[in-house]
Design a protein with these regions (language model features):
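Conserved alpha-helical substructure of the radical SAM core
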Residues: 1-63, 141, 152-159, 163, ...
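Radical SAM enzyme [4Fe-4S]-AdoMet core and its adjacent flexible, acidic
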Residues: 33, 37, 63-70, 74-189
Length: 189
């Protein structure tokens, strides 16, 4: 609630996630209150509600948006259970970039089903000049989920290794730090 947000201490970074944050009718109010508490806000979304996302970004152009795309088109749509999920997310990314949003990018939770898409999806994001954030499949105490398991760890690790090598080929220190983070994910899985 807004009252709860008002009680929060000062924060450096806030990630609004879900479920899907853009189904909330009070998301603008939440963001407005959080900016009183947080220096940086990023919203993780499936990118399905392009119009709502664009509307929020017009009011808060400094906000970060990460579209959760779980692989190339077929893989993403299978994992997300949305027939046009990839295209809708991709369209939202392009729309945000076209309107001048700077803190925009892909977010991918890596698992057995999508690990082979890790480097190809990174290359798409890199070509678009966007951020590429990764996470490893994990269980959550908050959602009482204990069946998220990576079954083929060597294969997933190899794909993370390939991503690390791609990131290290760049001239960007930020990408080198992302390589370090992704190398750490190999140990986590």
């Amino acid at each position: 609630s807004i009252e709860t947000i008002r009680k929060l201490p000062k924060m450096y970074f806030t990630n609004i996630t879900g479920g899907e944050p853009f189904i909330r009718t009070d998301l603008k109010e939440i963001v407005r209150e959080l900016y009183k508490k947080s220096d940086r806000i990023v919203i993780s979304t499936n990118g399905f509600f392009t119009d709502r996302i664009v509307d929020l970004c017009k009011e808060f152009p400094q906000i970060g948006i990460r579209i959760s795309i779980e692989g190339l088109e077929q893989t993403n749509n299978e994992i997300r259970g949305l027939q046009d999920g990839y295209q809708r997310g991709y369209k939202t990314l392009k729309t945000l970039r076209k309107m001048g949003m700077k803190d925009v990018g892909f977010g991918m939770t890596v698992q057995d089903k999508n690990a082979p898409d890790l480097v190809p999806l990174y290359k798409i994001s890199d070509k678009m000049g966007m951020e590429f954030a990764t996470a490893s499949l994990h269980n959550s105490f908050y959602f009482v989920e204990a069946k998220n398991i990576i079954h083929d760890r060597p294969m997933v690790a190899k794909n993370f290794e390939n991503l690390v090598n791609e990131l290290l080929r760049s001239n960007s220190p930020k990408k080198w730090f992302r390589a370090y983070f992704n190398h750490g994910l190999i140990n986590y899985i």
